[in-house]
Amino acid sequence: MRKLIETASSKVNTTQVAGKSHAHESAQRQVSGQARYVDDMPEPANCHHAAVGLSQVTSGRITHIDLSEVRNSAGVIDVITVDDVPGHIDIGPVFKGDPILANKEILFHGQPIFAVLATSVNLARQAVLKAKIDIDPTEACLTVSQAKAQESFVRPPHFMRKGDFAVQYAQSLHQLSGELKIGGQEHMYLEGQVSLAIPEEQDRMLVYTSSQHPSEVQKLIAEVLDIKLHKVVVDMRRMGGGFGGKETQAAQWACLAALLASRNQVAVKLRLPRMQDMQATGKRHPFENRYEVGFDKLGVIQATHVEINGNCGHSPDLSDAIVDRAMFHCDNTYYLGDSYIEGHRCRTNQVSHTAYRGFGGPQGMIVAEAMLDAIARKLGEDPLTVRLRNLYDDQQRNTTPYGMVVEHNLTKDILDKLTTSSDYWARRDAIKTFNATSPIIKKGLALTPVKFGISFTAQHLNQAGALLHVYTDGSMQINHGGTEMGQGLHTKIGQIVANEFGVPLGWIEVTSTRTDKVPNTSPTAASSGTDLNGKAAQNACITIKQRLAELYAQQFNADPTTVEFAGQQVNCGDNSIAFVDLIQQAYFARISLSSTGFYKTPKIYYDRATGQGRPFFYFAYGASCAEVSVDTLTGEYKVERVDILHDVGNSINPAIDVGQIEGGFIQGMGWLTSEELLWDGKGKLISNNPATYKIPAIGDTPEIFNVALYPRANDEDSIYHSKAVGEPPFMLANSVWCALKDAISSLSDYHIDPDLSIPATPEKVYWALSKIQSQLAQDGNK
């Protein structure tokens, strides 16, 4: 059951378009198969295809490479290794450590060693199999525990301190400690990694790619080819999903395609088959976290120590910022008292793990929920009661471990409203009664909040540009630095532009993201797409509106600030003119109808040396109530009902926002339940295809799924006072994990906190049930 809100709050600054539910701009083309992705584009004449040879060893040194049979294979045009790279070998996005092709050392199973160019994709992939490569294996580091024992890290540790944890912990009436193993997650985008590189005259290169960060792809291609950035243009119309997996990890394949295209002066397409895609690209970071918490007789936290340990794989990639964000979010909505947070970036011989929706936030936030559950069961209280007692308030208990004051805190009101709308307390009583009389099926219930910080934690990335053209018939083209991966960014940008000028949405064309239109862009990540690019687009609109307003107002000796744009008309007092007619006047008056726009996020800063600052412009809030049923004989379970209340500020497009909330929740539920990454004892990923890696299916969707938007404008000056909606809903799924623990704990009358690692597969649920049953049996024999 789905609840859609057709219109936004009346406070939205809207005339016709913003604040209303409009279909995704590509929806009809996508469902009819007409939307073009990179692999759907008509191939240029004489287009060739590339394939990549991957290491079958996890750690070692290459002693000999024989590619003669590869070169002699049918249809092969070129074969390259790292020795054929004219420019930079290392394509690490921030810190070094990511060779475009293996450079003597093998760092993980599935590492690209060479690339082949052939006349067809099948011939290229067949040729790859003929390589003979000798590798001298070395001992691999496969776990966080091994990395810590070997002091193997990709970056230095980071610390946040508030007060004196040791003193307060020692003085606390109650003390608890625990640890939580948290699995990674495959992005499983429907469109895999793909790039098409087309060489042009004068060493120029045009690249079509499926990337969240075209400017980074442009930069790395230029460095690999040893040319200037202005020689490379990257075009990105749409992705078939990204989720962070195409923020940095798309660049390698684009660079290889461009290198082969440059060497052979032919168009080159490189598309990874699904199994290779899963082997060679990074995942959500697995974490192994530990906590110590001291609290009083009511369960109010007095002191907290959290140790965050991220499995980063073989190189830094974005791990520094990802572990930082896990640290920033290990408080969630709770005041941790005197706190000590430490974060470690562990190096292992796995693929370099990377960005994924939430960017470390989920792996940190789930620790807070684990702590609150443990406290509640220690005291025999309902977990919701303990959660409410520990919320940040608006007085003294309102400062995070990193020194940011939690302003405009909506958590308490959202929890109160959802507690009522979900009928939490009545259902809690009913579930206790049910469990008391049901020997096999046990039900669980949990209501958990979310507080998620919005901004890139790397300050310089919080900027965006746009380019707007108004044509003489009143239609417009807007280009911006954000990328469309199905989340509806282009739709919202189109709504913003249409709203600013008071014209229909159909008059606005949002063009493909291109590095020759808006330069030096930030990735579309950190839930910032609409916040940054929407403001930049609005800025471009305001510039042209000011020009038009001055032209029209001077005809009546009026103040240009009194001119309004609405309903395809431009009004100045009692005077009115059709928007198209004013555009014609501006053209004949030689007034520019083109403008750039720019925006940078205000107020944010963070001092890593002190671990203090304001890394986020604002917080997005939400809460979720989940009910599950668990079969205690098998560990199988079903999510029966979910109720969500989520804060999106003044929604620009309620239908898209609800869709993002639903999708984010289900994806988060998959991470917490069925999506298990498995490596064998030698470091090979064995859950490397859709048959062995289980994302949620339609049947896993809760039968009752209520989603509502919290109706309150953002207090900060975001675009139309809306809020980001990309990442925060992912963590609403924490309620499912907590509900599973609630059902398991019912075996002990809610006194034992289950040991349930993530993902909570049916096997792990069964083991957790068995552990409690064994403990109860032992206690009964004493």
Language-model segments: residues:
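Short acidic, glycine/serine/threonine-rich loops at helix termini
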Residues: 89-94, 127-130, 209, 218-220, ...
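Thiamine diphosphate
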Residues: 240-265, 269-271, 489-497
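Glycine-rich loop/linker segments at domain edges
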Residues: 20, 26-33, 159-195, 286-371, ...
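Flexible, low-hydrophobicity surface segments
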Residues: 1-156, 175, 263
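Short glycine-rich loop/turn motifs
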Residues: 48, 103, 191-196, 288, ...
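Conserved beta-alpha junction segments in alpha/beta enzyme cores
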Residues: 165, 169-225, 312, 324, ...
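C-terminal catalytic domains of large/alpha subunits in multi-subunit enzymes
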Residues: 82-85, 226-231, 261-270, 322-441, ...
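Glycine-centered tight turns that cap/initiate beta-strands
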Residues: 75-78, 231, 298, 507
